Amino acid sequence: MAIKIVNKTRSEQHILMREQRILLKAQDCPFICHLYAAQQSADRVYFITEYLLGGSLGAMIKMCGSLDINHVRFYTAEIACGLQFLHQRYIVHRDIKPDNIMLDRSGHIRLIDLGLAQDGVTSSNKISGVTGTLQFMAPEVLLEEDYDTAVDWWSLGIVVSWMAAGQSPFYHGSIRRKVIKAITRKEPKFPPWLDADVKHLLERLLRKKPEERLGVYRNIRGHRFFDTIDWEVLELKRSRPLFKPFKEILENRNMLWLEDKTPLHPMDGFSYTSPSWTRMLRRIRL
């Protein structure tokens, strides 16, 4: 298991409640990190989630530079399934990036860190706010316009570029002004050796106008890059990953037991324990 510990303040309680609510809505998705329990003490909240020991996609990219095209296809398809699950429930992630995409012990992906996610988002009920990680923000976010779930498809495009080319198509170092100018005004640049189908996919994910972005005007599953993907098998996690984490899996029976004291500022409706977590605790106590 993994434990996310967040200090509790009155001003941020609604944000913590929102994250808990979104994690519960995402419980049935095999491509999103599962919440086992949410607890609170006097001054902190605890999100207890599954431990994803395969590492992050970001770490893999740093180690490899770029990934084999079949790996890119497989990971992109699973990420797309996770995003579609969220979007069908009117949830926008807002921070899709390689470091927020983990691998489980079998090699399947999990989207993590829903702390910036927002629910209740539709094309007629947009949100605002410059939120996320600069290199992965969509133009409409940087221009401080209202936006919807289309921003996640843009971010996916940047992630795919990192996987396939080992770089961003808008890379301009760490100078914020230049990065913003490139994303909002310039066209993406790809290396000449980039796979033609990947390039075609990226050109449609990285459209400046949200309504013209693949994933918005058309289902991403129909793109030719995914012609070899059996989406029904993939959604059931019956597709065999091309990479399986080789780290030794050790059973850790050291559990965190929270102090039994009443929170100073209790958040009604926050505490939660999933049935699977209850069963796990029973097995450990035997």
PLM feature spans:
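C-terminal regulatory tails of eukaryotic serine/threonine kinases
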Residues: V216-L286
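Activation-segment/catalytic-loop signature of the eukaryotic protein kinase fold
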Residues: A38
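AlphaC helix of the protein kinase catalytic domain
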Residues: G58-L67
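Activation segment signature within eukaryotic-like protein kinase domains
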Residues: Y75-T76
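Conserved short submotifs of the Hanks-type protein kinase catalytic core
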Residues: D43-S56
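Conserved N-lobe beta3->alphaC-helix segment of eukaryotic protein kinase catalytic domains
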Residues: I5-Q27
